[in-house]
Each structure stands twice: as C-alpha cells, then as structure tokens.
Amino acid sequence: MPGSEPYGRLQYREINGKRMAYIDEARGDAIVFQHGNPSSSYLWRNVLPHTEGLGRLVACDLIGMGASDKLDGSGPDSYHYHENRDYLFALWDALDLGDRVTLVLHDWGGALGFDWANRHRDRVAGIVHMETVSVPMEWDDFPDEVAQMFRGLRSPQGEEMVLENNAFIEGVLPSIVMRTLSEEEMIHYRRPFLNAGEDRRPTLSWPRDVPLAGEPAEVVAVIEDFGEWLATSDIPKLFIRADPGVIQGKQRILDIVRSWPNQTEITVPGTHFLQEDSADQIGEAIASFVREIRAGDNLHREAAPEMNSAS
C-alpha cells in the first residue's frame, strides 16, 4: 500500500509578497519535481525516496496550491498560466537551482518545466516527463467523458462545479487514479481547498488554460514555442508513459512526444495521476536515468583533460 505521509519538511520563501512552500533536501545537482493541477508536492511523496543520494531534491507548491499562499482579491483572471509561471520561476530563481538541473514534470508542471528549460537550455541536464501538458490539443484527443468534463469547466457552469462543489478534488482526482485513495491521502489533497469560493480558483483556472482547439492563444503560443525546441533538442529525456493514460493516451499525442530526440520511454500502469499507482517504478526509473546522466558527465570531465593535452 502506498504511503500517505508527506515527504521531507516544507520550507517557505516569500515571492512577490506571498509565501510559497517547497521541499529542499540534500545537496548536489538539483532534481526538481513539479506538480500540476490540483495536486502539490505531496504527489511525489512515494517517488522522492528512490532518488535520495543522487543530488538535491526540490519540489515546489504552485501559488494557491499545496501549502503556498492564496492570492489576494482573486477572480476569473487569476491563477492563469503566466501568473503561475511568474511565481514559480521567481521561486526557482530564489532557490538558485544551479547549472545541472534535472526536471521531473507532470501535468501543468510539464508545460512550466518545458518552458523554463527552453529559456535556460544550458542549465538543463535532463528532463523526465509523464502525462504532461506538452502539445496543443484537440477535443477528440480526450476520452469522451473527459472532454465532456472540460466543456463544463470551461463554461459558466465551471464556477459552480469547482468553486462550490470542489469537483476537481472530490470528483476528477480520485476518478483518474486506478486504486482507491485512502481517506488520509484525500485529507492532504483537500486541505488547500477546504473553503468554498476563491480558495478553489486555481483548480478552475488551470483547466480553462488547457490548450484546446487553439484557445487560449497565449498558452498555445508558449507550448508551440517549447515544442519546436523539444523536437530538436538532444538534452536527455525520459518519457514515463501511463497505461492507459489520459492526456497522452491518444496516438496523435504519443507520436509527437515520441519524436523528441535522445529519449528513452518506459510504460507503467496509471491513468493521469500515475504517481499514485506506480510510484516505485517511476522512482526507480528516474534514479536510473539520473545515474546515467551523472555517468555521462563524469566521462565528459575525464575526456576534457585528454583533449586539452592533445591540443
């Protein structure tokens, strides 16, 4: 049975006047785990132990999520992609992640991490990604029931579904985990969104930003931009595919993601929140991937003096 206890100790940093929460354990080259909607660093609790001893382990809570502060006076224009990006990237800057960063990305953490990597190409040692927002999507890329849910969330009904009824936590989250989440686990996931109304706004803004049928255009542009780079970048990549998956289950999406160069693929059981069903396999795969990167770094360092002496 997967463990329900959080990993590590939450720390806090003030970013743009708001307190943001994060885990920051050990030292060395940073391995940065980034969640999406509606989760938090708690999602990685059973994955992180497998990477102990491999470097500095960092997992941040997005603004308004997990243990991070809520925004003041939020409304329909709050917690969208670019605002989230501003807060997260400022936190990463404040944490001084270094120049050999391995990114481990899920859901909207994927779009954010790919975006950061595209902007800091010379600082990225490797990228691990799973069930990420990574490609502009069409409605038929989703299973019918998921498409119907997103249509509701993106309609005027979305406020009632999420702000009043907490649909993403009480309905969506448990429905796309293969096992049944324990009550203790659900308590952790519910905690940031116990209060009805604007405290739940992040879990509504995110699905309204999913790049569907060309909208919202400003998010599609970001994803197209980093997608062009990923299609040609030789940075080492590990694609952890969920079987059957949700947002990367259709062949069109898989074909695009699989075309990225210098990439290894493994498959684990899971729908969307695969960390809740296959944490051990995911953690072991990440650890193996990081060890391979480290071995390549060592070979490069050993070869450099020989090249210099030969010249």
UniProtKB/Swiss-Prot annotation:
Known EC number: 3.8.1.5
GO cellular component: membrane
The AB hydrolase-1 domain, residue ranges: 30-148
Alphabetized GO MF terms: haloalkane dehalogenase activity
Gene3D superfamilies: alpha/beta hydrolase (3.40.50.1820)
Keyword Hydrolase applies: yes
Record has Hydrolase as a keyword: yes
Biological role stated in the UniProt entry: Catalyzes hydrolytic cleavage of carbon-halogen bonds in halogenated aliphatic compounds, leading to the formation of the corresponding primary alcohols, halide ions and protons.
Subunit-level organization: Monomer.
HAMAP family: Haloalk_dehal_type2 (MF_01231)
Protein name, as recorded: Haloalkane dehalogenase
Name of the gene encoding the protein in the UniProt record: dhaA
